[in-house]
Regions:
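A conserved glycine-rich beta-strand in the N-terminal activation segment of trypsin-fold
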Residues: 41-61, 110-111
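N-terminal activation segment of mature serine protease catalytic domains
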Residues: 25-49
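C-terminal subregion of chymotrypsin/trypsin-like serine protease catalytic domains
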Residues: 2-8, 59-69, 80, 162, ...
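Conserved catalytic-core segment of clan PA serine endopeptidases
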Residues: 30-31, 80-126, 131, 138, ...
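N-terminal signal peptide
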Residues: 10-27
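Conserved H-D interstitial segment of serine endopeptidase catalytic domains
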Residues: 22-27, 46-47, 64-67, 72-108, ...
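Chymotrypsin/trypsin-fold serine protease catalytic domain
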Residues: 87, 115, 121, 127-200, ...
């Protein structure tokens, strides 16, 4: 999943064809610092064929929230979720996946409604390093400080690959209407009503972070979705606004 890296091509193409999908491949953390899983026990690594591809957040003992583009067209037989680990490739516990559900309105091209729920094949046992996170009921306000975590690239070019240990970065929320305005580079067509943005100088999520949590006041406020490059000026990271899709999450978690 290299969405963040294909965004440049897509943006250039879209300038001529009026169609964007700026997506962030696997999201990543740039400009952050190491984080202990004990401080983010809801953080998980989504694995395909025994390799990290995306992040996710624990909603309940058998439900994980992630981005739709992280699981689309993937067989559950190839998927596992690593929980309770500081490292995406070791520690904690690997749980097989029983099923997943992508939002019915998910749009592969524009990445609208980029959210999915994963049902684990076996239930989690909660501990100091494995816990669920509650859902935000209201969207974070503009300028609010939020934390974003994951094992994604530390550099835009991916020279160092995925981070070996969990990373976290503090960003500031940019309200959806402002993010879609002429102040930034995306435009109204590409920042949907169910999206929210966040940024800070030289800080961002990057490839490998997609599907991971944006946390505000200890609640899940967003899901890392897409962006143009990593840490690019005038191109904030774009996230699914959890408060907007909260009803869908609750309903789907009870039926998947």
């Amino acid at each position: 999943m290299v969405y963040r890296f294909i965004v440049l091509f897509i943006l250039l193409w879209c300038s001529c064809s009026n169609a964007i999908p700026a997506t962030t491949g696997n999201g990543r953390i740039m400009g952050g610092s190491e984080e202990s899983i004990y401080n983010a026990p809801w953080q998980v690594s989504i694995q395909v064929s025994a390799r990290h591809v995306c992040g996710g957040a624990i909603y309940s003992k058998d439900i994980i929230i992630t981005a739709a583009h992280c699981v689309q067209d993937t067989s559950v037989t190839l998927m596992q979720v690593r929980v309770g680990a500081n490292y995406h490739n070791s520690g904690g516990r690997l749980i097989p996946v029983g099923a997943y559900m992508i939002h019915e309105q998910y749009n592969k091209q524009f990445k609208y409604f980029d959210i999915a729920l994963i049902r684990l094949a076996t239930q989690l046992t909660y501990s100091l390093s494995v816990k669920a996170i509650g859902l935000a009921t209201v969207s974070p306000t503009a300028g609010a400080s939020v934390s974003v975590s994951g094992w994604g690239y530390l550099q835009p070019n991916g020279a160092d690959g995925f981070a070996s240990s969990l990373q976290v970065v503090q960003l500031n929320v940019i309200e959806r209407n402002e993010c879609a305005s002429a102040k930034y580079g995306y435009g109204w067509d590409f920042v949907g009503d169910e999206m929210i943005c966040a940024a800070a100088p030289n800080k961002d999520a990057c490839t490998g972070d997609s599907g991971g949590p944006m946390v505000s006041e200890k609640l899940l406020a967003g899901i890392i979705a897409w962006g143009y490059g990593c840490g690019q000026l005038n191109y904030p990271g774009v996230y699914v606004d959890v408060a907007v899709l909260r009803p869908w999450i609750i309903k789907t978690a009870n039926s998947i």
